[in-house]
C-alpha cells in the first residue's frame, strides 16, 4: 500500500497493523516511519507549491516491481485536488475522490452546503468585509492554523477568503466513511501555539474532548447530514468551535 502525506508515520503504523506492507512518501522519514514501512521516499508535502512531478516520480520508484493495492493520501493534499487527481490516475485511490476534496475545500461551496444541511457555519466571503475587525483571513485548503490571521489590511486574491470570527473552544471530530455511512470515532480538544504573525498555529490535541451528551449528539447528527449530502470515504476530520450548547462547523 502506498502512503503519501506530510507525515506518514501514523498511517504506516496503522497499515502495518492491518496486514498491509506500507510504502511511504513523506517529509520526515523518521525512525518510527522507517520501522513500519518497506520503502520510503522523502517528499515535502508541506511546502507550497507542492512539487507534483517529484511526488509522482517518488511514488513510481517506490512501486517499481511491486503490486500495489492502492494509495492513501494524508495531510498535504488539502489544497491539492488537482494533484490528487494526478495520483488517482496512476494508482487506485483509497479515500475521498478529488471532486469531493475540491467541493469541501471550496469555502463558498462549503458554506452553501452547511446552509443546505442546517449546520451553523461562520459567514464567509471572498471579498473584504466593510468592517474587517470581526473577520479572519484564511487560505483555501489551509491546514494547521498557520494561514489564519486577522483580516484587517488583508487583500483579496486567488486562493484566499474571509470568514467572520466565531466564539468557542476548538474541537475536532475524527471520522471514518465508506462512501455511504460515516462513523464518528471520537472528538478531541485542540489548542493553539501562537507565533508572531501566526496567532492560530495548531498546538496539539487531546482526546476525549469534554462534551455534554446533547452537544455530542447534535454534532454527530450534523456530520451525518453532511455525509448524506457529500459521502465521505476513508478517514477525515471536521473542526468545530463549541460555545456552550451551540457550535459552528468550520
Q: Where are the regions that the model predicts?
A:
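A glycine-rich phosphate-binding loop feature that marks nucleotide/adenosyl-phosphate handling sites
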Residues: 239-246
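A short beta-strand motif that forms the metal-chelation/ATP-contact edge
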Residues: 136-138, 175, 246-250
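Flexible, glycine/charged-enriched surface loops at secondary-structure junctions
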Residues: 233-238
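Residues at the starts of beta-strands that form the adenosine-phosphate
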Residues: 21-24, 181, 250
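A conserved helix-loop-beta module that forms one wall/lid of the active-site cleft
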Residues: 89-153
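ATP-binding N-terminal substructure of ATP-dependent carboxylate-amine bond-forming enzymes
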Residues: 1-99, 108-109
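ATP-dependent carboxylate/phosphate-activation module, predominantly the ATP-grasp catalytic core
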Residues: 164-231, 242
Amino acid at each position: 500500500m502506498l502512503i503519501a502525506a506530510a507525515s506518514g508515520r501514523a498511517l504506516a503504523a496503522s497499515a502495518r497493523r492491518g496486514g498491509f506492507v506500507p510504502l511511504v512518501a513523506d517529509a520526515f522519514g523518521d525512525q518510527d516511519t522507517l520501522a513500519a514501512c518497506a520503502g520510503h521516499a522523502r517528499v515535502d508535502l508541506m511546502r507550497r507549491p507542492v512539487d507534483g512531478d517529484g511526488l509522482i516520480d517518488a511514488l513510481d520508484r517506490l512501486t517499481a516491481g511491486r503490486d500495489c493495492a492502492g494509495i492513501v493520501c494524508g495531510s498535504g493534499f488539502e489544497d491539492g485536488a488537482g494533484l490528487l487527481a494526478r495520483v488517482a490516475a496512476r494508482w487506485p485511490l483509497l479515500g475521498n475522490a478529488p471532486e469531493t476534496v475540491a467541493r469541501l475545500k471550496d469555502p463558498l461551496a462549503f458554506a452553501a452546503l452547511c446552509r443546505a444541511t442546517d449546520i451553523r457555519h461562520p459567514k464567509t466571503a471572498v471579498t473584504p468585509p466593510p468592517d474587517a475587525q470581526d473577520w479572519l483571513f484564511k487560505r483555501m485548503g489551509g491546514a494547521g492554523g498557520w494561514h489564519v490571521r486577522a483580516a484587517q489590511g488583508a487583500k483579496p486574491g486567488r486562493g484566499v477568503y474571509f470568514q467572520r470570527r466565531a466564539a468557542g473552544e476548538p474541537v475536532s471530530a475524527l471520522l471514518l466513511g465508506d462512501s455511504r455511512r460515516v462513523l464518528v470515532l471520537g472528538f478531541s480538544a485542540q489548542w493553539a501555539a501562537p507565533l508572531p504573525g501566526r496567532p492560530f498555529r495548531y498546538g496539539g490535541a487531546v482526546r476525549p474532548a469534554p462534551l455534554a451528551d446533547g452537544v455530542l449528539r447534535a454534532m454527530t447528527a450534523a456530520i451525518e447530514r453532511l455525509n448524506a449530502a457529500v459521502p465521505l470515504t476513508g478517514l477525515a476530520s471536521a473542526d468545530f468551535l463549541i460555545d456552550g450548547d451551540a457550535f459552528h462547523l468550520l
